Curated annotation (Swiss-Prot):
It comes from the Eukaryota. It is an enzyme of class 2 (transferase). Expressed in roots, hypocotyls, shoots, cotyledons, rosette and cauline leaves, stems, petals, sepals, stamens, pistils and siliques. One of its GO terms (cellular component) is chloroplast. The gene is RSH2. It catalyses: GTP + ATP = guanosine 3'-diphosphate 5'-triphosphate + AMP. This is Probable GTP diphosphokinase RSH2, chloroplastic. Possesses ppGpp (guanosine 3'-diphosphate 5'-diphosphate) synthetase activity in vitro and is able to functionally complement E.coli relA mutants. May be involved in a rapid plant ppGpp-mediated response to pathogens and other stresses. It is found in: Plastid, Chloroplast. Its main location: plastid. Induction: Circadian-regulation with a peak at noon. Induced by wounding, salt stress, 12-oxo-phytodienoic acid (OPDA) and abscisic acid (ABA).
Amino acid sequence: MVVATTIALYASPPSSVCSTPHQISCDLDLTSRSSSTSSSMASSPQKPIVGGLSSLFSSASVKSSSSSSCSYSTGVDEFSSLRYDRSDDLKDLSFSSSFGYSPAKFVNSFRRDHQSPISVLHGPVSCSCSPPMRMSRDRNLDGSFRLGASGLFNGFVRKALGSCVDYEFGSDSVLVDELTFPMEVDTIKPYARDLLRRAQLRHKIFNDESVIKAFYEAEKAHRGQMRASRDPYLQHCVETAMLLANIGANSTVVVAGLLHDTIDDSFMSYDYILRNFGAGVADLVEGVSKLSQLSKLARENNTACKTVEADRLHTMFLAMADARAVLIKLADRLHNMKTLYALSPVKQQRFAKETLEIFAPLANRLGISTWKVQLENLCFKHLYPNQHNEMSTMLEDSFDEAMITSAIEKLEQALKKAGISYHVLCGRHKSLYSIYSKMLKKKLTVDEIHDIHGLRLIVDNEGDCYKALGVVHSLWSEVPGKLKDYITHPKFNGYQSLHTVVMDNGTVPLEVQIRTQEMHLQAEFGFAAHWRYKEGGCKYSSFVLQMVEWARWVVTWHCEAMSKDRSSISSSDSIKPPCKFPSHSEDCPASYKPNSSQDGPVYVIVIENDKMSVQEFPASSTVSDLLSRAGPGSSRWSMYGIPAKEELRPRLNQIPVSDLKWKLKMGDVVELTPTIPDESLTEYREEIQRMYDRGLAFSRPGTMVGWGS
């Protein structure tokens, strides 16, 4: 039998904010998901989907009242078999596309320590800063570099993100006997203790008691679960949480990152997480689970290969989930892409294609360039290995480290002479995939791309950006037509910077990017940089402020609904009324939520004859409107009447439709034709005939058609 499923989601912003579309994506599986937990642990029944996807972040009372409804069961994502133990092999891929040079310290050591042909495209080395603000870099255990105590991250990032960020590193882990929650010490495996100890050395937030508790709960939930290489699944959970910590996520988000697969892959339920960690964490984990389910559905239907539908899917996904759940899903996908080698070549291609078309654009829409670059380069490596290797070698051979070092010294002296202080002056390199895409799009050779080599300068304020630009143009010849003022005219995702291309020694083009600290924060971390941002401390253009607030409001729609009837949750977790747009109080949950009143359009996923399409409907569309568009010949039942037998009726959020005028809302799930076993066809033949007769009667003038009995 034909099964048609519809998922309706709004894509437009609230009327008072910027209407620029955003993108996101995720993983959906409507088949049964098996659990590989210990046999001694009974599996909790899945919670039903009530109100469709719009109930992802509904109140606990709503969730409880819906327990009698039917639910989808989910299936294991192929990524559950991935592993992560080759940190040395992957360290070159874990960096962003920018890196720095020190005139003396790393001239000889860079090539010796980084033999990978693509290391020059990903690995930061050293930065030059004007006294007394010169910064040192310390190497993390995960292969990335972090600025020192007086550096960029501990300076403007903490100021921008407030208590949401903790970039301090601590070497002292919390002792077991200091914890306030009970822990089965004897049952904890040695590898888990070591994993936590190493995580605590990499980031201080893993010393937080709630994070430690989540770690041990994740260990218990995934105990015995292994990836394809037989490495513990817990390692993936830790790496996902570490990625979140490294972009400034607070303990709530890191805890949810550790637990992100527990609902799908273990005995844990939403209620279990709610009791142990509160509604905030439980909602995030459930949100990630639903995003994974949707992405699975899109992947199975090859939506990523359909440009228009993929773009609609990005926008639709952005409108359905808490931003923090979106970031957790992105971190999950980024780590899975780093360990994609564990899958078969066919699956590698499929996941890389989906990541390139869905997840990388999502990271771009949210402005998280560090993740976008890594995702794109990893996809490039798996989708086009020959081109990847060829370009890596070509760029390694053509890379002129001495030229970059000389340019840094020259600009440093000129800035000092002009009295312009700065925070960072470093070399940067365009990413492999970005170069490849530009060559294809504009039909250029590598020699014709002017922004492969470059410098990045971070100054105090907007005025200094333009002063520094004048200094740059006084040192080198400007390439006509290559000046781009993204400060006055920001990109759609809020990116701001000055870009210019100059000729060094008349032969080698050199791109120079100039921005403020706040602009750099926006460029690197995008939406994530503004979870707790105080707008009063930064002079952003009104456009960028709109984009920041739009990201806050668009990522979920349920703010006002969540503020009602949360009697089962402690007062500390209760939802306050949303602040007036666009400002928010420090702890206002509305900083993650959009206005709940949306006025269209509605994006709808329609699955029919095992094919999925993403369609757009006007606001206030009804089930009848959807059926009219589908047409009478597209399914087995008549659009003019609905049978009395509930088994044959279309279903809205698992409930048989009783009124065709029901409006499609954000996240509604509509099954146009339930699957009927062949042995039941005889039983329903009479009912199907009545449906057909009703359709004929409807076509006669003046005939009213009811439900029939």
